[in-house]
Amino acid sequence: MRVRGMQRNWQTLGNWGILFLGILIICSNADKLWVTVYYGVPVWKEATPTLFCASDAKAYEKEVHNVWATHACVPTDPNPQEVEMENVTENFNMWKNNMVEQMHTDIISLWDESLKPCVELTPLCVTLNCTDYKGTNSTNNATSTVVSPAEIKNCSFNITTEIKDKKKKESALFYRLDVLPLNGEGNNSSTEYRLINCNTSTITQTCPKVTFEPIPIHYCAPAGFAILKCKDKRFNGTGPCKNVSTVQCTHGIKPVVSTQLLLNGSLAEEEIIIRSENITDNTKNIIVQLNETVQINCTRPNNNTRKSIHMGPGKAFYTTGDIIGDIRQAHCNISGEKWNMTLSRVKEKLKEHFKNGTITFKPPNPGGDPEILTHMFNCAGEFFYCNTTKLFNETGENGTITLPCRIKQIINMWQKVGKAIYAPPIAGSINCSSNITGMILTRDGGNNTHNETFRPGGGDMRDNWRSELYKYKVVQIEPLGIAPTRARRRVVQREKRAVGLGAVFFGFLGAAGSTMGAASITLTVQARQLLSGIVQQQSNLLRAIEAQQHLLQLTVWGIKQLRARILAVERYLKDQQLLGIWGCSGKLICTTNVPWNSSWSNKSWEEIWNNMTWMEWEKEIGNYSDTIYKLIEESQTQQEKNEQDLLALDKWASLWNWFDITKWLWYIKIFIMIIGGLIGLRIAFAVLSVVNRVRQGYSPLSFQTLIPTSRGADRPEGIEEEGGEQDKNRSVRLVSGFLALAWDDLRNLCLFSYRQLRNLILIVTRILERGLRGGWEALKYLWNLVQYWSQELKNSAISLLNTTAIAVAGGTDRIIEIGQRAFRALLHIPRRIRQGLERALL
C-alpha cells in the first residue's frame, strides 16, 4: 500500500511538473522578438546622385538658353506633386549642398555652349594705332550721358588677308576697357595699344550673337531619390527645418550670372532673410534675400553698326563699324525711394546680428577685377559693368538713381581661369529690365566693434545658385526596413517568387512622420506609388532621349540622362536582389527565423512601434544593419538547405499517396508480372521434372496417374467385393491439361494470398483496437485528471474565499467594536468630567 501511494504521489508530481514546464515555456516565448523585414518604409539618407534638368524650352527659339535647354533637359511635368511630411524635422545646409555644385557645372556648360568660340583672335595680338572716337553725325549736345571721347578708341592695324603673304590695313572700334597702352597702363596720351588679354590668355571670338535671355530650369531627382524642400518662411539655410515636404523637381531657377546684385530670383515670403555660413567671419559672403523686388532698367542707347573683317579663309572678325549720333553712355535706372527703403530694411535685419554696432554701407574698395568692383551682368548679349557707388553711399536720394555702365567685349570667363573671349557687338540699341531680388555683401574686418561696414561683393557664382537652392536637399530612399516583431517564420515550404513592386519613389514619404505601426499599414499603397513613379519617370526620360537622339550623340547631357535612368534601375535591382536572397521576393512584410538581439536595441515592442518613426528607428539600429543582413542571409541559406532535404523525402510525406488512383495501374502491372513469373516457373520446373524422369527410364502413361493418399484415422475402411480388405492408402487424380494446371496454380496462389491478407488485416485490426482502446483509456484518464484538478482548484478557491471572507468579517467586527468603544468613550467624557468635579467638590 505504501508503494502504491508513493507511485501515485510521484505521478501527481510528474503531472504538475509537466504543467509548470509548459507554462514556463509559453511565458518565456511570449515576449521573444524576431527580425522582420519591411519593404517600402519611409526612410532616407543624404545622397549625391546625378540630377537631371527639366525646362519648357522651345526648340524653334534661337535664344541660347532655349537652345541649350532643348537638348540638355527633359520637358517639365505638367502636374508636379508635392507631398507634405507632418511631424518631420530635417537638417539642411545650403553651404554644403551638392545641388549647388551640379548647377554650377551645368551653367558652365550652358555658357560654354552659348559663347562657343568660332574664331581665334590671335592674329589681332598686334600693335593697334588708336585715337579717340567721336562718332558720326554727332550733335555735340553735352548731356550727362554722353561718353568721354577717350572711352571708345578707333584703332587701325595690319592683318593677314586670305592670301597669307599679303597684309592689309583695317580699322575697328574698341572700348577703352578692352585695350592697354603699350607704354604703360597709366599713359593716356599713347597712341599704341594692344588687346588687354594678349599676354595672359588665349582670346577667342564667340559665334555671331543671338538673343540672350535666361529661362527657368528645374532640377529633378532620379527615381529612387527624392528632393526635400524646407517650407519654413524664416529659414536661414542651415539647421533643422520643421516644415518639410518632398518634391520631384525644384522650382524654376533662372541661371542669371551677375555680381553684387542678384537678379530675377525668388523672394522671401515674409521678411528679409540674412544668410551666411558664419556671419561673424568677415571672410564669408552674406547673401541677402529681399521680400520685395526693386526694378532696374538698363540700356545702351547708341545706334551701333556691325562690320566684319576677314582674317583668312573662313575667318571673320566682327567689330563695331560706326556709332550713329551721340556716343552716349550705357546706364541703368533704379527708383531711389524704393531702393533706400529696401536698404533701410536690410540694415534693420543686420542689426539683429550685430546689435552693438552701427550698420553702414560703402562702395567696394578700389583695386581688383572689374567683375568685383562693379555690378556685372549680361544684357541682351552685351556684358555690362555698372558702377554701384550711388547705391551704397547712402546719400538718401529719392529720385531716379542712374548707374553709369561700361561695356566690355573681351570678357574674363568666370567659369575658367586664364581664358578670355571676345563678344561681338550687338547692332542697334539695347534695353533690358530686371528685378533685384537680393544682394551679396561682405563685411569689413578689424577691431572696430562700434561700426560695422558692409560692401557689395560676389564673384563666386555658387552664391548665386545657393540663393535659390538653399531650401532643397537630395536624399536617397532606403525602402528596406528591419524591426523586431513577435512573428516568426514557421513554414519551410518554398515560396513562390512573385514579381517585385519596384523601387521607392518620393510619393510615400507623406507617412514619414507617423509612428512605425501606423506607417507599416500603408506599405501596399506606398509600394504601388513607388512603382508608378519609377515607371512614369523612366518613360519620360526615354521619350525625351528618343526625341533628342540627334542632339545627344555622346554629349555630356545624353550621358547624364542615361545615367539617371540606369541609376534608378540599379537601385531597383539592388533592392530586389536583397529581398530574393532573404526569401522575401514580392512581400511587403517578411518574417524571418533570426531572433532579435537586445544588444541592437533594448527598447520594448510597445516603445518601438507606438512611439518611434521609421527615421528615428533607422538611426537607432543603423550601426547593426550589416550584421542583421548577414544573419538573415545565413538563416535563409539554412532554410533553403532544409527545404532541399525535405523535398528529397517528399515521396514519404504521406501514406495516402500510396493509394493514389494514378498508381493503381502500376500496381496491376507489377501483380501481372508476378503471376506470370510464377506460372512460368511452374511450367519450367514441370518440364525439367519430366525430362529428368525420362532420362532415368521412366515414361508416365498419363497425367492422370493416381497418387496414393492416406485415409484419415476417423474414417472406416471401405469393403470391396468378396470382402477383401483394401490398402489404407487412396489415390487422387491430377488435373488434366495445361490450362487446367495453370488455373489450379493460380487458384491456389489467390487462396494463399487471400488467407495471408486476411490474417494481416486481423492482426492490424487487433493492434488498432488495442491502440484505440489504450488511447481512449488515456483520454479518459486525462479527462478525469482535469476534472479532479479543476474540482481541487475550485475547492481551493472556495476555501480561500471563505477564509478571506471570515478574516475580513472578523476584522470588520473588530473595527466596528473599536469604533463603538471610541464613540462611547467620547459620549462618556462629559459624564466623567461631571463625576470628577463632583468628587472634587465632595
Curated annotation (Swiss-Prot):
<feature type="glycosylation site" description="N-linked (GlcNAc...) asparagine; by host">
    <location>
        <position position="431"/>
    </location>
</feature>
<feature type="glycosylation site" description="N-linked (GlcNAc...) asparagine; by host">
    <location>
        <position position="199"/>
    </location>
</feature>
<keyword id="KW-1161">Viral attachment to host cell</keyword>
<keyword id="KW-0449">Lipoprotein</keyword>
<dbReference type="InterPro" id="IPR000777">
    <property type="entry name" value="HIV1_Gp120"/>
</dbReference>
<feature type="region of interest" description="V5">
    <location>
        <begin position="448"/>
        <end position="457"/>
    </location>
</feature>
<keyword id="KW-1160">Virus entry into host cell</keyword>
<feature type="glycosylation site" description="N-linked (GlcNAc...) asparagine; by host">
    <location>
        <position position="356"/>
    </location>
</feature>
<keyword id="KW-1133">Transmembrane helix</keyword>
<dbReference type="GO" id="GO:0075512">
    <property type="term" value="P:clathrin-dependent endocytosis of virus by host cell"/>
</dbReference>
<dbReference type="GO" id="GO:0005198">
    <property type="term" value="F:structural molecule activity"/>
</dbReference>
<dbReference type="GO" id="GO:0039654">
    <property type="term" value="P:fusion of virus membrane with host endosome membrane"/>
</dbReference>
<feature type="glycosylation site" description="N-linked (GlcNAc...) asparagine; by host">
    <location>
        <position position="623"/>
    </location>
</feature>
<feature type="disulfide bond">
    <location>
        <begin position="125"/>
        <end position="198"/>
    </location>
</feature>
<feature type="disulfide bond">
    <location>
        <begin position="130"/>
        <end position="155"/>
    </location>
</feature>
<keyword id="KW-0053">Apoptosis</keyword>
<feature type="glycosylation site" description="N-linked (GlcNAc...) asparagine; by host">
    <location>
        <position position="303"/>
    </location>
</feature>
<feature type="glycosylation site" description="N-linked (GlcNAc...) asparagine; by host">
    <location>
        <position position="291"/>
    </location>
</feature>
<keyword id="KW-1043">Host membrane</keyword>
<feature type="region of interest" description="V2">
    <location>
        <begin position="155"/>
        <end position="198"/>
    </location>
</feature>
<keyword id="KW-0564">Palmitate</keyword>
<feature type="glycosylation site" description="N-linked (GlcNAc...) asparagine; by host">
    <location>
        <position position="236"/>
    </location>
</feature>
<feature type="glycosylation site" description="N-linked (GlcNAc...) asparagine; by host">
    <location>
        <position position="333"/>
    </location>
</feature>
<keyword id="KW-0899">Viral immunoevasion</keyword>
<protein>
    <recommendedName>
        <fullName>Envelope glycoprotein gp160</fullName>
    </recommendedName>
</protein>
<dbReference type="Pfam" id="PF00516">
    <property type="entry name" value="GP120"/>
</dbReference>
<dbReference type="GO" id="GO:0044175">
    <property type="term" value="C:host cell endosome membrane"/>
</dbReference>
<feature type="region of interest" description="MPER; binding to GalCer">
    <location>
        <begin position="648"/>
        <end position="669"/>
    </location>
</feature>
<feature type="short sequence motif" description="YXXL motif; contains endocytosis signal">
    <location>
        <begin position="698"/>
        <end position="701"/>
    </location>
</feature>
<feature type="disulfide bond">
    <location>
        <begin position="386"/>
        <end position="405"/>
    </location>
</feature>
<keyword id="KW-0325">Glycoprotein</keyword>
<keyword id="KW-1162">Viral penetration into host cytoplasm</keyword>
<feature type="glycosylation site" description="N-linked (GlcNAc...) asparagine; by host">
    <location>
        <position position="447"/>
    </location>
</feature>
<feature type="topological domain" description="Cytoplasmic">
    <location>
        <begin position="692"/>
        <end position="842"/>
    </location>
</feature>
<feature type="region of interest" description="Fusion peptide">
    <location>
        <begin position="498"/>
        <end position="518"/>
    </location>
</feature>
<feature type="glycosylation site" description="N-linked (GlcNAc...) asparagine; by host">
    <location>
        <position position="188"/>
    </location>
</feature>
<feature type="disulfide bond">
    <location>
        <begin position="298"/>
        <end position="332"/>
    </location>
</feature>
<feature type="region of interest" description="V1">
    <location>
        <begin position="130"/>
        <end position="154"/>
    </location>
</feature>
<feature type="glycosylation site" description="N-linked (GlcNAc...) asparagine; by host">
    <location>
        <position position="129"/>
    </location>
</feature>
<dbReference type="Pfam" id="PF00517">
    <property type="entry name" value="GP41"/>
</dbReference>
<feature type="glycosylation site" description="N-linked (GlcNAc...) asparagine; by host">
    <location>
        <position position="187"/>
    </location>
</feature>
<dbReference type="InterPro" id="IPR037527">
    <property type="entry name" value="Gp160"/>
</dbReference>
